[in-house]
Each structure stands twice: as structure tokens, then as C-alpha cells.
Amino acid sequence: MKTFYIVRHCQADGQSKDAALTPQGITQSHELAQFFSSIHLNQIISSPYKRAIQTTEPLAHAKQLEIKIDQGLSERVLSSKPIDDWYEKLKLSFTDLHMTCEGGESSQEAMNRIVEALHEQIKLETDHTLFVTHGNIMSLLLKHADPTLGFEEWKKLSNPDVYILKYFSPDHIEAKRIWQ
């Protein structure tokens, strides 16, 4: 069995790749470090987005771990252009995994990307890996573990949020929310 901790970034000021944590988000990042203080971690892997990296900096410092960057943990791009009904499109994308919007990534494509990042770590000897990522891509990884999960679970994610994912085999993955 391999253990993964999947973390959604703390509160941020916007959705761009360069969006930083808010003052509240910075406080949350320190609370997150405290939350993990008694949990053994071997490595931290983050999305390249600024808010994800800032989320894990206090934890990486406390654990004396390097923050590795993996593009596979980047947030899913629903569309490259603004869309008025993005909420409805996002909802539909949880049932129609192959639906795409202009310049965007389907749920299936995004799921494949984050599952590939997970499988790359499964191949290694390292256990107790922490991924820092984003809400939509995180919910797609959880949907991979449990196909009954979807849009409603995405709506319930908090900033930050933490799930433990236990990988026993390709057909046996358990995911559980552990953030209070």
C-alpha cells in the first residue's frame, strides 16, 4: 500500500497561475503545517501555480523537505475563453467526461493527467507523498478512486482541504477526507 495526501491549496486571490494566497490563506498554510506536524511525509509535490507552492511552503520548511513541481498537478483549464455558463459546463463535465469547451481540457484528459502523476509516484519506492493541487483536478482524482463522486463533492471542497488516498492496487484505492 502507498499513502498519498491530496491537498487543495489555501484561500487565494484569484484563479490565475500567479494568484497569491490572501492573508487568510497564509494563515491557513501555517494551520496546514500544524495539521501535518505529527504525520510522516517523505516528499511534497506541488502544482507549479503560485498559490499551491505558497500553501506548502510552511509545511516544507517544518519538515525540511524540498517542494518538487509537477505540471500534472496543475488546475484543469475548462476553457481558454471566458464563458458565461461556466458553472453549468463544469457540472456537465462531471457526467460527460469527454465534453470540452473551446481551448479547454475534458474531465477525462485532466483525470488522465493527474492519475499519471499519481502512477509515476506509485512506481517509486517513496511512500507518504503529499500532493498540493487545485479543486477541480483534485475532485477528478477522487472520482478516479470512487466513480460515484462528482460535482456535488467538488462543491463541498474547502480551501484548504485534505484527503488521504490509500493505493492498494489499480482496482483498490480508498479516499477519505481528513481535514476538519
Task: Label every PLM stretch briefly.
Residues 4, 125-136:
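Generic beta-sheet signal
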Residues 2-67, 103-108, 160:
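Active-site-proximal alpha-helix that buttresses catalytic centers in soluble enzyme cores
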Residues 46-47, 112, 132-133:
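Short beta-strand scaffold positions
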